[in-house]
């Protein structure tokens, strides 16, 4: 017996993409977030990422640009996504804080991992398993 085909592509969004969607309402990260809200694809997240979003949104550099109620609404919305409780922990990344993103991509068999971070080495990997690692602009051009 074969497995059923997924109806929607699965996408892991780096926390920097999600925060960028809140900061700049007309950029490609916001286009991606709105496309997910319109059910154009499935977001994969984790309890680790939801905690990171809550924590990062309180950083002093974000206080002036992130409204707490918008961050709260995003976290609440993401709790309705595919939330992984404990992604694998044995994944290596150039930036150890990005390992959970790679783990989510592998555990969920995601189609894309979308990141804004050019310095951490995620984009240089190009893919992990079958998951393509791309910028928000590239994701919009390829998938939306």
Label every model-predicted segment.
Residues 1-45:
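Short, well-structured N-terminal submotif of metal-dependent ribonuclease cores
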